[in-house]
Amino acid sequence: MVTYSYDHIHIRSREPMETARYFNNMFGAKILESVQTDGQSRVDIDINGLIVFLAQADTTTPDGPVDPYVGLDHFGLRVDNLDTAAADLKSKGAEFSVEPKDLRPGLRIAFVRAPGDVRIELLERSG
């Protein structure tokens, strides 16, 4: 049987370093600069083991689709206390597209909109 495990998320950005700084400021991501196999520079970030590659988008690259759409919708970050996390992120200027709310018993969620319209779900799971 083949075993699969998480490796990375790859995001194209008009401003990779600006996007990396956003993730550093909001989520404490470590910023790592690297070079892709094609020789292009890339900014990688590490959010507590969640690796995200931020590659420079060409000026001709179209913006992403309007929500909702088929394909990758968002990625989620688990937090111990959603209200505390939301207050912390708001104090740093984060834009919430969905304010903290109860989704079902044992699950509270919120959504943050990062640069490039990347959607990040915050999840507080209990029980």
What are these regions (language model features)?
Residues N25-L32, G93-E95:
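Conserved acetyl-CoA-binding loop of GNAT-fold acetyltransferases
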Residues P68, H74-L89:
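Mid-chain, well-packed structural core segment of small domains
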Residues M1-A20, L72-L77, L123-G127:
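N-terminal beta-strand motif that seeds the catalytic metal site of vicinal oxygen chelate
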Residues M17-M26, A110:
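Conserved active-site alpha-helix within GNAT-family acetyltransferase domains
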Residues S5, G39-S41, G71, G106:
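Exposed loop/turn and edge beta-strand positions of beta-sandwich/beta-sheet ligand-binding modules
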Residues M1-V2, D44, A86-G127:
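Vicinal oxygen chelate
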Residues K30-V66, R119-R125:
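Conserved short beta-strand elements that form part of the metal-binding/catalytic scaffold
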